[in-house]
Amino acid sequence: YIPVVSTVGCDAEGGVYNINADDAAAMIAASLGAAALISMTDVSGIMKDKNDPSTLIPVIKTSEAPYLVESGVIAGGMIPKTRCCINAVNSGVERVFIIDGRIPHAILIEMLTSEGIGTMFVKG
């Protein structure tokens, strides 16, 4: 199954709230016992130098991610996305991917090739 979920919520008084889509996806994937979660964005994945696509980090272990944040490799909007990836893996999702959704067939390339095209988070 591929759940499609709106991340807009409301409270008892009818107030409307924007719920972080990455947080929602991580929680849903963990609750479903998903083997994988794919986050499609407008960047190739986590890069050592955000301006140099050749520095893409193909695999990040959950234990390595805090160092990458502290050292500034992971910065800005990628910090909460990384946090969600780590939370999903630590909650039982085997693999979490960040891939560039602008690339045609990005999901197929990531899932069906040995090298992939994005960054994969795994436990470790």
Question: What is each PLM-predicted segment?
Answer:
Residues 1-124:
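C-terminal catalytic "cap/lid" subdomain
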